[in-house]
Amino acid sequence: MNTTPDTPTPRALRELTPLEARILGVLVEKQHTVPDTYPLSLNALTAGCNQKTARAPVMNVSEDEVTTALDGLKHLSLVMEGSSSRVPRFEHNMNRVLGIPSQAIALLTILLLRGPQTAAELRLNSARLHGFADISSVEAFLDELAARAQPLVVRLPRAPGARENRWMHLMCGEVNMADFASADAGGGADSVPPSEFEALKAEQKRLADEVTRLNALVQRMASELGIDVDTPGNAS
């Protein structure tokens, strides 16, 4: 699945920090989803880094931290700062520096923002960046990214009970495959991935908070009406 990027000569890069990787992902994402505000101001870029949705892990970074990370990315030529506005604005230069086409950039961006994904998840989550015809085309680009002299992605061992392998980016360094293999070997067919487990815990807490709120509302209304009501929280 070879298409010609802006430049055919990729550069060897150092490992990125998690924040540097997040910044690159945000810049590519916002280039496609909010083109009217791209290149991004420091404030918009920081907000994108701290976004609660479509991010794993969720971050809470300051503008000073983002500025420091931007300096590192500018040194690598991965980010450029515009000079046509009084407010500094930043844009990515990933296509030229990495020497990969826009389709591959779209997949890499989702991995930078959301963590490990299956090919099917990547096709779904990258729809606003590029419309892949099918999963096989996604896998073809992933295979090319993994086969580079300096691989940008890796296929992870299949989790117990999973139907597909997940993929992970390597922009922040190599992955210890033994960690994934040992975790997989220790799990059973009903094992729940950590991300799904955390989501279930968050949902459980949300439901518990909602029950508490409703109980309080029932008690208040009963008190106003002079009615005695036993709620689960008050049952003996």
From Swiss-Prot:
Gene3D superfamilies: Winged helix-like DNA-binding domain superfamily/Winged helix DNA-binding domain
Domain of life, per lineage: Bacteria
Disulphide bonds in the chain: none
HAMAP family: UPF0502
Family: Belongs to the UPF0502 family.
UniProt name for this protein: UPF0502 protein BceJ2315_62050
Organism: Burkholderia cenocepacia (strain ATCC BAA-245 / DSM 16553 / LMG 16656 / NCTC 13227 / J2315 / CF5610) (Burkholderia cepacia (strain J2315))
